[in-house]
A protein has these predicted regions:
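Dinucleotide-binding Rossmann-like beta1-alpha1 core, especially the glycine-rich loop
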Residues: 70-157
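Short beta-strand segments that buttress and anchor functional surface loops
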Residues: 287-291
Length: 300
């Protein structure tokens, strides 16, 4: 959100509604979540909906820019190979002709123009570059053994299932197992789980802390063990024509995905709409937004 809009929202004093628009469904925010909701409605043959987006273009942090030479992402820039549980993502990729053949196949074929081998990470430590995300120079045999055991256990957890038959750590997260034995991990910190399972190596705690800060914005001592393990064990998508750690991407990052979603909401996205009031009534929801300098009331 630009500072100008933020200050306008803070200052208040908006004019009374100049017009009222009615719709069956109103989606506030045209980021990936909002566009996904619109895509789902369109696929269900629901066409009476609107998307309100504050910026000049929908897409949130999946938008892209364009230089004279090449497009470039502003934020989100790759998609891991979708898991079997990610049926909606696979359906979208099939619509966009990036996933070829059966979208429910264990190892689908993907358009090679969107496939990218995972960039190999490296760490700058003590004035030297080291390959991989974990340091190995000057690490004793005991710490190296812990690193190997941790990676092996995460590979096991990628296939682990609960008593309900679901994967312990799935994407979408809501499809993960509800088995109490796995869910109990949500009640202890990730750092505590590591220590309790013999993972005391400083390099592993550094990696865990890096991971949780990157995805959740919190230290591994503030993140639940379930969430921390989900980071490492949720991705198990495969492809017939790529390694399992490959990703789907393009020069513009994830903008191609965003535009694929937005296409299904064509004509129903209201940009430059800053919502400043939401009121839930008995029969409907009333939303006031500034659009083109005037307040428009939306009723859904």
């Amino acid at each position: 959100m630009s500072h100008t809009l933020g200050h306008r929202l803070r200052d208040g004093g908006f004019p009374a509604p100049a017009e009222t628009r009615k719709t069956a469904v109103l989606i506030i925010g045209g980021g990936i979540s909002g566009l996904s909701a619109a895509w789902r409605l369109a696929n269900a043959a629901v066409d009476d909906f609107l998307v309100l987006e504050m910026e000049a273009e929908a897409g949130g942090n999946s938008r892209a820019g364009q230089s004279p030479l090449v497009a470039y992402p502003w934020g989100a820039h790759y998609l891991p190979l979708p898991t079997l549980e990610s049926t909606s993502v696979r359906q979208l990729l099939a619509e966009l002709k990036v996933l070829q053949g059966d979208p429910n196949a264990t190892q689908p074929t993907y358009d090679e123009r969107y496939l990218c081998a995972t960039p190999q990470e490296r760490v700058y430590r003590n004035g030297l570059w080291e390959e991989g995300l974990l340091p190995h120079r000057g690490i004793d045999a005991g710490e190296r053994a812990q690193q190997q055991r941790f990676h092996e256990l995460m590979d096991e957890f990628k296939q682990a299932r609960g008593s309900d038959g679901r994967r312990a750590f799935a994407i979408p997260m809501a499809l993960s197992s509800r088995d109490p034995l796995w869910r109990a991990l949500d009640r202890i910190p990730f750092s505590q789980w590591l220590n309790a399972n013999g993972f005391t190596a400083p390099s592993l705690h550094w990696l865990a802390n890096y991971a949780t800060r990157d995805d959740y914005g919190m230290a591994h001592s503030q993140t639940s063990a379930w969430a921390g393990l989900h980071y490492f064990a949720c991705r198990n998508g495969e492809a017939a024509n790529a390694a399992s750690d490959a990703v789907l991407t393009a020069p513009e990052g994830n903008a191609w995905l965003m535009r694929g979603l937005a296409k299904r909401a064509s004509g129903r996205i209201v940009t430059g709409a800053m919502v400043w009031r939401i009121e839930e009534g008995k029969a409907n929801v009333v939303v006031d937004a500034v659009v083109d300098g005037k307040t428009v009331r939306f009723e859904a």
